[in-house]
Amino acid sequence: MGKISNYLEMIEDIKNKTPEKEAFCTGNSSLTYRELFLLVKEKQKKWKTAAKKELYFIQKEQALDQLTEFLTCQGMGYVPVILPKDMEEDKKTALIQKFCAETKVPEEACMAVMTSGTSGENKLLFRTFESWYNYFPIQNEIFHITPESRLFMQGSLAFTGNMNLYMAQLSAGATILSEDRFDPRLWIKD
């Protein structure tokens, strides 16, 4: 594979090297890198490519659904923004209208993250693929993330720290063990 330019291509690269390696586990289900890639490619067939960069808002309950929607946006012209799953509908509608009306999406953006709003209102921060991907080798070395690593995660990908850890883990060809509720007793089973 040539130069990797988005997160789905990153998954494809790992899939080409270790297709049957576990990528994501939650509850009683598990996806290999091949299965994750094929699931996202199947979703992409149902989408139209955006004519220009545009925001795509994701609000899903399960981390796997958040991840697959995020990956589906890659290479399709959409810049995903994962919203907290518990965001009230009226606030969500107002934010989407505001962001769509006031925000020019940078051409090089591959994703946007929403600030927590501690300063009074939520803001969007755009990220390029390279801004995270090029740092993952250093980050993974610091935290000893290898293809054999298994990272236990809990919580929404709307939280930027979780999204970064997911992508760093996947960039190493490692495995994510995800739970939607905080209960370390569940991790013992995985």
Where are these regions (language model features)?
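Conserved AMP-binding/adenylation subdomain of ANL enzymes
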Residues: Y133-R150, A158-D190
